[in-house]
Amino acid sequence: MATALVNARVLTADGFRDDVAVLVDAGVIDAVVAADDHRVSDFDIEDLGGDLLLPGFIDCQVNGGGGVLFNDAPTVATIRRIGEAHRRFGTTGFLPTLISDDIDVMREAIAAVGAAIAEGVPGVIGIHLEGPYLAPARRGVHDETKFRIPDADDIALASSLRNGRTLLTLAPERVPVDSIRELVRRGVIVCAGHTAAT
């Protein structure tokens, strides 16, 4: 069904606009047009009563939600529950986030995210691995007994997700530059965090 969303404060690239209509066809935004555009009359009208209309939020660090933590149960069911909890607040895309943990838990988490994407769990766009390549002095809530310097197996695992994006937070002073280069070459988005670098 094609719908024109009208009478809303719409967030656009130019800021909030009150004088536009959002044309939606089959659940996809087709166009944002002037409210008096002739095409609006070709759509079913849905009056939003002056409410805000915003794009969905993308959250790149989601450790849990709905009463569950990803580290405690890195499964598709956990990811689904986390997504449902965050969707109520406007999150439409997210990266389930695993903090520093054992290699087996990392493997389970990456497999669960891959399966969630393959199954079409709404909103899952990849995984965020926050550690375990972090600085002990900046560990925050991370268990430093899980910290390590990545080897070739770690790099292969961190870059193993095939159907989504991988964001990896690491302390650059704890990871050899060649390892960082290899991660990037393999498509991993590398971010500095929990670092004591100056």
What are the roles of these predicted feature ranges?
Residues 53-67, 130-141, 175-179:
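N-terminal small/glycine-rich loop or linker at the start of catalytic domains
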Residues 63-65, 80-109, 123-135, 162-173, ...:
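Divalent metal-dependent hydrolysis catalytic cores, especially in the metallo-beta-lactamase
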Residues 64-76, 141-148, 167-169, 191-193:
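Active-site mouth loops of central-metabolism enzymes
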Residues 82-83, 107-114, 155, 180:
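Generic structural signal for well-ordered alpha-helices
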Residues 148-198:
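Histidine/acidic residue-rich metal-binding segments in metalloenzymes
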